[in-house]
Swiss-Prot record:
Transmembrane spans: none
Record protein name field: Argininosuccinate lyase
Localization per Swiss-Prot or TrEMBL: Cytoplasm
Main location per the UniProt record: cytoplasm
PROSITE patterns: FUMARATE_LYASES (PS00163)
GO cellular component: cytosol
PANTHER family for this protein: ARGININOSUCCINATE LYASE (PTHR43814:SF1)
UniProt xrefs under Gene3D superfamilies: Fumarase/aspartase (C-terminal domain), Fumarase/aspartase (Central domain), Fumarase/aspartase (N-terminal domain)
InterPro entries reported in the protein's UniProt record: Arg_succ_lyase_C, Argininosuccinate_lyase, Fumarase/histidase_N, Fumarate_lyase_CS, Fumarate_lyase_fam, Fumarate_lyase_N, L-Aspartase-like
EC number annotated for this UniProt entry: 4.3.2.1
Superkingdom to which the source organism belongs: Bacteria
Pfam families: ASL_C2, Lyase_1
Length: 458
């Protein structure tokens, strides 16, 4: 027998020491202790209900597991690499504490369905927590939008000045992204929140278990329908990693803008000192380390997605040891996403907006040129002709170092006799912004309406 191994009956030689270290997962899967114990308690209660094991053994098992939980949370539990993983560490300790009753716990289950349960329980809780962090970030964005409700800034395409927009409208763009992220997390929860326990190693179990009872005890709305798929499925983890990658992409895009906006060239915003660092050599520096690091961590999350996809891509049914590699990418992504969301929500809430700088930038770069074209269209000119006229007026302004509002009416009429003095009212920043009143536009009225809609939870 391989000494001290709960599976060692078939073996005549001990496990190689380095193999033992190489194959152990306890260093990282010990974070599943709470889920493992919770699942074992539910399994034990079901075994007792079904009279598969005696009720007195069930009570010993439950009491022993609760004591082990207390020991782990008090930092008094010594994890052993020789016991490989969290499941064997807990089961071995349980048997040492309560004797033969502890050895009955694993009746009717395998580590294959046990670990599938633990991961689903763990991810289920984390999905709820990540959704709550997304709510905090959305609240920070809405708060900034409300504080700066009428602040005008340049909108960009190709990072070139395009049209004036409200800063609040820009914040609401990220609100939409993070609301979609929350929706994806909620969808992922539906496919995560399914009980796999009862699948056994791969084919089910010969014992008369009651899977639906375990599902009820663990708050799962349904059970898996195929034992092979139950133990080999990691789609729910992959789906989360994909959703997390999109979420981090949104944070990375936002980070890029915050980094640009905080430069001395833009000066659109000031990030709080608490979210920046200095230079070891340049005394004047205030570096936006937080958004830079979030931007960098995005690649890490992408890598975790690719790592698990690559692990799973060639695995035959059912369980394979390769699948031990599912946990570190999952755990690392959860930690990264939660940390990034928390720090981002706090940073955005404390961010200061330089309103005059934004407005002055919006007034440059011919940002109201489209409004001139729209003005001519309303006067009866076809849009393509209007586009040509305004393009020529912009070229004239560039050559004469002027902006559109600085043109005299005589100069305007040189481009089209349709233009009259009312052109000046049409190309103010406020007029440009507020003319875009359709749903989803940047008008002040529309932005206020959108903030109210999101605040109402719609």
């Amino acid at each position: 027998m391989s000494k001290d191994k709960l599976w060692g009956g078939r073996f005549t030689q001990p496990t190689d020491k380095f193999v033992e270290e190489f194959t152990a997962s306890i260093d990282f899967d010990k974070r599943l202790y709470h889920q493992d114990i919770r699942g074992s308690i539910a399994h034990a209660r079901m075994l007792g209900k079904q009279r598969i094991i005696p009720m007195e053994d069930v009570e010993k098992i439950v009491h022993g597991l609760q004591e082990i939980l207390d020991q782990i949370e008090a930092g008094k539990f010594d994890f052993s690499i020789s016991l490989e993983d969290i499941h064997m560490n807990i089961e071995s300790r349980l048997s040492a504490k309560i004797g033969e009753a502890g050895k009955r716990l694993h009746t009717g289950r395998s580590r294959n369905d046990q670990v599938a349960l633990d991961i689903r329980l763990y991810l289920r809780d984390e999905l709820v927590e990540i959704s709550a962090y997304l709510d905090l970030l959305v609240d920070s964005l809405l708060t900034q939008a409300e504080k700066n409700i009428d602040v005008i800034m340049p909108g960009y395409t190709h990072l070139q000045t395009a049209q004036p927009i409200l800063f609040a409208h820009h914040m609401l763009a990220y609100v939409e992204m993070f609301k979609r992220d929350k929706g994806r997390m909620e969808d992922c929860l539906k496919r995560t929140n399914i009980l796999p326990l009862g699948a056994g190693a791969l084919a089910g179990t010969t014992f008369p278990i009651d899977r639906e009872h375990v599902a009820e005890l663990l708050d799962f709305p349904e059970v898996t329908r195929n034992s092979l798929d139950s133990v080999s499925d990691r789609d729910f983890a992959l789906e989360f990693l994909a959703d997390a990658s999109i979420l981090m992409m949104h944070l990375s895009r936002f980070s890029e803008e915050l980094i640009l906006w905080s430069t001395s060239e833009f000066k659109f915003i000031d990030l709080s000192d608490g979210f920046c660092t200095g230079s070891s050599i340049m005394p004047q520096k205030k570096n936006p380390d937080v958004p830079e690091l979030v931007r960098g961590k995005t690649g890490r999350v992408y890598g975790n997605l690719m790592a698990l996809l690559t692990v799973m891509k060639s695995l035959p049914l059912a369980y394979n040891k390769d699948m031990q590699e599912d946990k570190e990418p999952l755990f690392d992504t959860i930690d990264t996403v939660k940390g990034s969301l928390k720090i981002f929500a706090d940073m955005i809430r404390e961010m200061q907006v330089n309103t005059d700088t934004m407005r002055n930038a919006a007034a440059k770069g011919f940002s109201t040129a489209t409004d001139v074209a729209d003005y001519l269209v309303r006067k009866g000119m076809p849009f393509r002709d209007a586009h040509e006229v305004v393009g020529k007026s912009v070229a004239y302004c560039i050559a004469n170092k002027k902006d559109l509002p600085e043109l005299a009416i005589e100069e305007w009429k040189g481009f089209s006799p349709m233009i009259d003095t009312d052109i000046y009212e049409a190309i103010t920043l406020e007029a440009s912004v507020n003319a875009r009143r359709a749903t989803g536009g940047t008008s002040l009225e529309g932005v206020k309406r959108e903030i109210a809609r999101v605040r109402a939870g719609k």
